[in-house]
A protein has these predicted regions:
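Absolute N-terminal positional cue centered near the fourth residue
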Residues: 1-5, 36-39, 275
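N-terminal chloroplast transit peptides
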Residues: 1-29
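Intrinsically disordered, low-complexity serine/threonine-rich segments
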Residues: 18-31, 308, 315, 324
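N-terminal mitochondrial targeting presequences
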Residues: 19-22, 33-44
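A composition/secondary-structure signal for short, hydrophobic, low-basic-content segments
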Residues: 26, 33-35, 168
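Catalytic cores of Mg2+-dependent Asp-rich isoprenoid enzymes
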Residues: 43-202, 209, 213-331
């Protein structure tokens, strides 16, 4: 999740540097807290330091990127980062069993309710509470949707029933991050919301196809069960890394769906001023390279080494060049 957050924060940095301005709708599922006082205080300093330490430990590059933002925007983006990072730590804790992780995530839902009631537990919660208060147009449902997706992901031998369920999961764990960041961009939701969600979902679907082998090692199969069954492929076949022509056909179908989402995101980039369209196009082309790589290897994304599908530095540079050329020729 934090990797997706880094991508979206980079877009935020770009957008604020180029004067990109957006607005979001007022669609919330939780009761908002009483007004907070925003003057600089020792409490605010404690919040900043707590989150900086978290970034320094886990994502030092992101800490550097956050310094490119003005103070208020950096503080809000960092508060969102801390929320996502600490959720990751709950689900990635190797010492916890499924029941414990599920309980901790339920506790985290209640904790978010407390944030909305201005009852933060610690300094990092307080930072998020201030972000919520400063942005009346912030949608609160994505915070809960993300936790729901993470709960489902903790189930042993995780499977997905159909494409609709896969789309919902991709929204929960990736599209939600974009919605959380929209207030930082001041986005016009009618013009940008669907494209932003499409980009997040595409990134997640491509990550699933890219990371199939390491996911199998964790007992997780994210390809739709109905599609596998229609091709005569069982979950056990996938867990045993049997990459049959029928299995690869399902991979190709999901890859086509991811490409359609990339196209939707690509079409939505025209609403962005400045160099915003360029950076969206770069992300689209980078992730499209994974789809090209999958096609080149015959959609065989299972291997005994447990490694994910990779693209090299030259491919990444070429994707960036391709994106730049596309944007410049479209002007």
């Amino acid at each position: 999740m934090t990797r997706r957050f880094c991508i979206l924060l980079a877009i935020t940095v770009l957008s604020k540097c180029t004067g990109f301005s957006f607005r979001t709708s007022n669609s919330c599922t939780h009761r908002r807290m009483p007004a907070l006082h925003h003057h600089r205080s020792s409490s605010t300093t404690n919040q900043d330091e707590a989150i900086k330490e978290l970034m320094k430990t886990h994502d030092p590059i992101l800490l550097f990127v956050s310094r490119l933002l003005d103070a208020d925007i950096a503080r809000d983006a960092s508060a969102l980062y801390a929320w996502c990072r600490r959720l990751d730590e709950i689900t990635d804790d190797p010492s916890s069993d499924v029941a414990t992780i599920q309980q901790r995530l339920s506790d985290w839902e209640r904790r978010f309710d407390m944030i909305c009631r201005n009852e933060p537990v610690d300094d990092m919660d307080r930072a998020l509470a201030m972000y919520v208060q400063r942005n009346d147009d912030l949608e609160l449902s994505p915070f809960v949707d993300m936790i729901s997706g993470m709960k489902e992901d903790t189930v042993q031998n995780r499977t997905i029933s159909n494409m609709a369920e896969l789309d919902e999961y991709a929204y929960q764990v990736a599209g939600t991050v974009g919605l959380m960041l929209l207030p930082l961009l001041k986005a016009n939701v009618e013009k940008s919301r669907d494209a932003a969600i499409a980009l997040g979902k595409a990134i997640q679907l491509i990550n699933i196809l890219r990371d199939a082998s390491p996911d199998v090692a964790l007992g997780r199969v994210y390809l739709p069960q109905d599609m596998l069954k229609a091709e005569g492929v069982s979950t056990e076949d996938v867990l045993q890394l049997k990459s049959s022509p029928e299995y690869r056909k399902v991979v190709a179908t999901v890859a086509d769906h991811a490409e359609a989402l990339l196209i939707e995101a690509e079409m939505g980039k025209s609403t962005l001023p400045g160099v915003g369209p360029l950076f969206v196009q770069i992300i689209v082309e980078l992730y499209r390279e994974y789809l090209i790589k999958l096609e080149q290897i015959g959609y065989d994304n299972l291997n005994l080494s447990g490694e994910r599908v990779k693209i090299n530095t030259i491919q990444k540079l070429m994707a960036s060049f391709k994106a730049t050329t596309k944007v410049l020729t479209q002007k």
